[in-house]
From Swiss-Prot:
Its cofactor is Fe(2+). Its main location: cytoplasm. It is an enzyme of class 2 (transferase). Its EC number is 2.3.1.234. HAMAP family: TsaD. One of its GO terms (cellular component) is cytoplasm. It is found in: Cytoplasm. Keywords: Acyltransferase, Cytoplasm, Iron, Metal-binding, Transferase, tRNA processing. Required for the formation of a threonylcarbamoyl group on adenosine at position 37 (t(6)A37) in tRNAs that read codons beginning with adenine. Is involved in the transfer of the threonylcarbamoyl moiety of threonylcarbamoyl-AMP (TC-AMP) to the N6 group of A37, together with TsaE and TsaB. TsaD likely plays a direct catalytic role in this reaction. It comes from Clostridium botulinum (strain Kyoto / Type A2). Fe cation binds at H115, H119, D306. This is tRNA N6-adenosine threonylcarbamoyltransferase. Substrate binds at V138, V139, S140, G141, G142, D171, G184, D188, N278. One of its GO terms (biological process) is tRNA threonylcarbamoyladenosine modification.
Length: 340
């Protein structure tokens, strides 16, 4: 096998169009991201049809910019990695069809990547010496998982949400208290001005035999609190509501992830996904894990949000195992982690 394996990666599962060139799964030569946040902000959330159209408008330019920044041509690329699920089906299809076209035209192998696996693999970019096994908390707008990474590309899901994802709950609560979209960063910011002990919102605790999450109850409790305040004509302290809600979500995420670590006897927790940028989650996880002698690994913001570099990393580890994907592959919007 060549000393350097160059992956061109494409990500378009939601509202970011991204392309990257990644070498040997850990070195990023380029990572171009065209965000649609300003487009969807006025709608209060991502509009799938609008997202798909925006991907179509920019994907060619984004891929070319990724190659140019890396000073590569397609001849220098060994394989093309692309997200094929989970995500918005129309958005996924834009990136997938573009990648399939490149693979067909160049004869390069196509490697379909699970978006969640990509988030986990972002840690290999930031932490060059990281090797399995380790625990990973994946928290984003659409997904919440506790994953035990046994080996490269081998996962065991120990806990997942039974309803709303953590990031989804953040967005809905932010909308309810008038903060707008995207909710996660706005709740994080205003919470710094609030008292996290001001309001006691519930924590979803299941039986001891599961590490699953439920955030719909917390979300409903916040909405009920707001409705009661409004009906009584009482003033609502948005900062206190945001801080108290945030703490209730973070406490459950941290507690379950530490329990998972203890059950598998691992001493490393990697964090992935957009909600990993939340300052309360970072601080609480580091503080509580320190008490247990567990190391916490958190990538920088650019690798927490949706990006193609993480897809390139995951694709590399598939490539060296000799795995590639048929050009008949289709988008799988509800793809499960570990499915092929």
């Amino acid at each position: 096998m060549k000393e350097s394996i160059n992956i061109l990666a494409i990500e378009s599962s939601c509202d970011e169009t991204s392309a990257a060139v990644v070498v040997n799964g850990r070195e990023v030569l380029s990572n171009i991201i065209a965000s649609q946040i300003s487009t969807h902000e006025k709608f209060g959330g991502v509009v799938p049809e609008v997202a798909s159209r925006k991907h179509i408008e920019v994907i060619s330019a984004v891929v070319q910019e990724a190659l140019d920044e890396a000073n590569f041509t397609l001849d220098d690329i060994d394989a093309i990695g692309v997200t094929y699920g989970p995500g918005l089906v129309g958005a996924l299809l834009v990136g997938l069809q573009y990648a399939k076209g490149l693979a067909f035209a160049t004869g390069k192998p196509l490697i379909g990547v699970n978006h969640i696996e990509g988030h986990i693999s972002a840690n290999f970019i930031e932490y060059k010496d990281l090797k399995p096994p380790f625990m990973c908390l994946v928290v984003s707008g659409g997904h919440t998982f506790i994953v035990y990474m046994k080996d490269y590309g081998e996962f065991e899901v120990l806990g997942e949400t039974r309803d709303d994802a953590a990031g989804e709950a953040f967005d809905k609560v932010a909308r309810a208290i008038g903060l707008g979209y995207p909710g996660g960063p706005k709740i994080d910011k205003i919470s710094k001005e609030g008292n996290e002990e001001a309001i006691k919102f519930p924590r979803a605790n299941f039986h001891n035999d599961t590490l699953d999450f439920s955030f719909s109850g917390i979300k409903s409790a916040v909405l009920n609190y707001l409705n009661k305040k409004e009906m009584k004509g009482e003033e609502i302290n948005k900062a206190d509501v945001a801080a108290s809600f945030q703490k209730s979500v973070v406490d459950v995420l941290v507690d379950n992830t530490i329990k998972a670590c203890m059950s598998k006897k691992v001493d490393k927790i990697a964090v992935a996904g957009g909600v990993a940028s939340n300052s309360c989650l970072r601080e609480t996880l580091v503080r509580e894990c320190k008490k247990k002698g567990i190391e916490v690994l958190i990538p920088p913001f650019i690798l927490c949000t949706d990006n193609a570099a993480m897809i390139g990393s995951a694709a590399y580890f598939e490539y060296i195992k000799g795995r590639s994907t048929s050009l008949d592959i289709n988008a799988v919007p509800n793809l499960k982690l570990g499915e092929r």
